[in-house]
Amino acid sequence: MSFNDDDDGMLLNFTTDVSDASETVSRGKITGGKWKDRRKAKMMMEGRKPRVRGEKRPLESDGAPTFEELEASSSNSTSAQAPVEPKRSRFDNSSNVEQPARVTQPLQLNSQIVSSLFTSSRNIDTVTNSNAHDEKAEVTYSNAPLVGDTFDSFGITDTMVSHLNVKMKISKPTKIQKLVIPPFLQAQNDLFIHAQTGSGKTLAFLLPIFQSILSLGQNITRQSGCFALVVTPTRELANQIYQVTSELAQCCHFLVPCLLIGGERKKSEKARLRKGANFIIGTPGRVLDHLQNTKVIKEQLAPSLRYVVLDEGDKLMELGFEETLKEILNIIHGIDIDTHQFPKLPKRILHVLCSATVKGNVTKLGNVTLQNYKLISSGQKQTETTTVPDQLLQKIVIVPPKLRLVTLAGSLTTITQKHYKEGSKSDVTRTIVFLSCSDSVDFHYEVFSSHDGNHRGLVGDTARLLTKGNSILPCFNDTDDPNVICYKLHGSLSQQTRTATLKHFATNNDATKGKHLILFCTDVASRGLDLPHVSTVIEMDPPFAVEDHLHRIGRTARAGCEGESLLFLLPGEEEGYMDYIKPYHPKGWKLLTYDEQVLRPAFEGLNVRRTDKKKEDWDKHEAQAWDNNATTWHLNVERRVIEDSHFKELAVKGYMSHIRAYATHLSIEKKFFNLKCLHLGHLAKSFALRERPKSMGLQQGKAGAAAAASQKKPKEDSKSKMLRMAKMAMRQSNDEFNFA
């Protein structure tokens, strides 16, 4: 088509495409009918097939691979792989063939991958042990009772000495008790008591207080007033000191202790305070609460308070109780003390601070609370590093993240087998497994206590006895009785449950006779608790501070007894943690290999039954290779995660909480515990999870959105709304003060 412009003589030519015009006409707008019909007709005109509702896109498979598929993939691992096409240069124009666009598939929430336990692990750099334990060296029991000394030589009365020998089975003092009791009785200075864990610090400050009260020669009752206030960082430690005080008070029944801790009814505590108490033991928050709001407690303190003891001072500061302690001391110092009623007692309040360490914040607390104090240390100078007991055998195993769970199973199995061989039918073996968070405790407790339903509850749901037929630990057959009790303990449990669980774990009775007791717990059980006959402490998650490491392993090898401790570390940066804790282990440690020294002894010579197979198809006499047994055991736990939604929720919560807890290590230790260096997928394997970490995050977000949506009120239908509006109009019309 041409156009001639007569004004300027220009000739314009326009070229049009006939096919485009026809296509435009053919793709006219469709009118009439429903929008769905119009949409369907338009897609048919464009040559697209309408998608049927409910039809899924052909993406990845949502189902988990079966065990047979895993075995097939592992057996064909040596087969030749498909050749990989070399990458083309972005400047290569040799081919003009149009390449298909790259489609990025969306992340699937339920996609799962079964990975092998023993492949694709990070190399372990530590080959030789730089701090090897000398097994031939002579062991000196650093916190054992002294043979050549007695309590009566320190000025303790015969009544108290006899009670210690007969009722409490304590005949000899420890080194720290020998150093503390004489200056405590003189009451000339405040005291800073520094000693190893398990050396007897509790009796070191309780015995002089009892001796001072018994030496008064006056008629003492519970109404005579409170002589001592003991403040501890945790409820469990406060409860333990209360039990020791009550046991000591049996030789002088007129002395009454009182326990003030969170989680208990304040009304009951106030009633006990009104009746009178000679010893008050409690946690900082609850003690301050009563000092501020309970009038009778100040009346109890005025005539008799002479001793204020702060136990585990480093933990008090670590938990942020500095301001609370200052308020407690300000209130106490503001009370006018009557020295005429008990003239033989000290003329002022004697402050005592106990701690296993003498550096950092605890020194600051000592400067705040103590005046003209005397440092008493069990043979160690203040500048020296606190060391572990000499009779403690420390072991360290470097475990790839995928193998953490099965290695823990192997360790617990080995300890149980040792209990069967070396212990008698009445001996009790106790093992404590420390984990980083309460959700991880719940998961591991569920793994080892209720895998196949063969268990019986003892203390609510926090203690379970494994019964005959249990295949998870430590026997893998249907004929042997496991003789294992599993416990869990963490701060999220109620105080009554925590107390009952700890009491059951620490008591030797018919229920625990001849059994292996396993306690899964957080650091709530790492401070000051004197649990009898703890043979092994397992630190599956490294502590958040080196002081916590000392207190954790201090639950064993107490009062001259032998003990073992096992620390789990990951390959890579965490291996440097060994050099960091080396000064605290002058006797060295044993470096174990996870495969040959942990897994092989536990799983060799067995035939672990697969849970997806019938018992009739299982030949228990046909032994399998140890690595096959370990893999089967772990896959059994993974199948349970798939089949049990509640157990899967515990696994996901445990994994996510473990990641968050891992990021809270002290800044000085970040070079060993760096979150960026973790392989999150392999770590998820240790929680028996097959999902990718991103999928778990999306699942949690989707679950939270669903929970929020379920809380929304249902939409009101038109009929209900009309009736509601009519009733509202009637009420307004009947109101005589309606001016609308």
From Swiss-Prot:
The Low complexity compositionally biased stretches are 697-711
EC code: 3.6.4.13
Predominantly, its location class is nucleus
Domain Helicase ATP-binding residues, every copy = 182-376
As given in the record, the signal peptide range reads none
Pfam families from the UniProt entry: CTE_SPB4, DEAD, Helicase_C
Q: From the record, which residues define motif Q motif? A: 149-178
| Biased composition range(s): Basic and acidic residues | 43-60
One of the record's GO cellular component terms: nucleolus
Q: Please provide the record's keywords in A-Z order.
A: ATP-binding, Helicase, Hydrolase, Nucleotide-binding, Nucleus, Ribosome biogenesis, RNA-binding, rRNA processing
Chain intervals with Polar residues compositional bias: 13-25, 72-81
List every stretch annotated Disordered.
Answer: 1-104, 695-721
Q: What class of enzyme is it?
A: hydrolase
GO terms, biological process? rRNA processing
Q: Motif DEAD box: where?
A: 311-314
Q: The Helicase C-terminal domain covers which part of the protein?
A: 414-607
Q: Name one GO molecular function term.
A: RNA helicase activity
Q: Which reaction does it catalyse?
A: ATP + H2O = ADP + phosphate + H(+)
SMART domains assigned to the protein according to its UniProt record, in alphabetical order:
DEXDc, DUF4217, HELICc
Compartments, record wording:
Nucleus, Nucleolus
> For ATP, which residues are the binding ones?
A195, Q196, T197, G198, S199, G200, K201, T202
Query: Belongs to which family?
Result: Belongs to the DEAD box helicase family. DDX31/DBP7 subfamily.
The written remark on domains in the entry is: The Q motif is unique to and characteristic of the DEAD box family of RNA helicases and controls ATP binding and hydrolysis.
Further information in the entry reads:
Present with 1460 molecules/cell in log phase SD medium.
Role of this protein: ATP-binding RNA helicase involved in the biogenesis of 60S ribosomal subunits and is required for the normal formation of 25S and 5.8S rRNAs.
Please give the name of this protein.
ATP-dependent RNA helicase DBP7
What is the species listed in this Swiss-Prot or TrEMBL entry? Kluyveromyces lactis (strain ATCC 8585 / CBS 2359 / DSM 70799 / NBRC 1267 / NRRL Y-1140 / WM37) (Yeast)
